[in-house]
Structure formats: structure tokens, C-alpha cells
Amino acid sequence: DVCSSDLSDGLAIAEKHGLPGIIKEFIVSHHGTTSTGYFLTQYLNDGGDPEDVAEFYYDGVKPVTKEQVVLMICDAVEAASRSLKDYSQQNISSLVDRIVDGKVREDQLSDADISIRDINRMKEVIKSYLMQMYHSRVSYPKRKENAKK
């Protein structure tokens, strides 16, 4: 089961290395109680029983701090951004909005002391960062050995 192994493996690694409790709290809250969207959708599209979907939901806890919310959002956006075929400003903006709005709709942020203003600011910062990260660069040509200096 992908969902439970992600959390249990993360906690086991944290225990093995003696990481503090606060790190373990981040591990169990970074997916909250969300579904594994890809696997759940694939299961349902393949004719899976909509009443038998518990294994497609993480058994973590909802984030309770702003920092845990930031990790949850950044983790989800980073993973989803890898699937983009076009890193245009519009596509990046739509992706970030869809993911953050989905977390709000799924009630994942309700236990955290975070304002709408904080959420909107986070969205803008993430969009800006992704645009910088994925902007294309000009390919610099190598100078030919016989080229004039």
C-alpha cells in the first residue's frame, strides 16, 4: 500500500537517525489525509469500486502549523510540476492554483492557523520560484578552436 508505506518508511528513517519529534510531525502531515490522486483516478477509471477506496488515502494527519502547510503544498506542487509538458506562466499558475485550491477544498488546511492572505502569498511565491526554475535558457555555443579571438 503506497500511502501507508510512505509514512511508515519516513517515520522509520526518522527513528533510525534519531530525528526529533518535530521532524516526525512534518512527515506524518505532509500528505495530510489526501488521496493519491493519480492512483485513485487510475483505479476508478479501470472500473474500481468507488466504495472501496480507503487504501488510496494517506493515514497521516492534517498540518497544524504554517510551516507544515508550506511543506504539504510545496511537496505536492513539486511532484506535479514534473508532469508539465509546457512550463509557460499560464500552465505553472494553473497548476499551483489547482493544487492549493484542491487542498483547501479537501479541508486539509482547516487545522492550521493560516490566513487566506498567507495562502495567496504562498501561491505567488511558488509560482515565481517555478517560473525561475523552469525558464528556458539560451544554449551557449562552444567557440570553435579555429575561431578568431
Q: Residue ranges of each PLM-predicted region?
A:
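Short, small-residue-biased leader/transition segments that mark boundaries at the very start
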Residues: V2-S4
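Terminal helices and disordered tails flanking the catalytic cores of nucleotide-processing hydrolases
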Residues: D6-K149
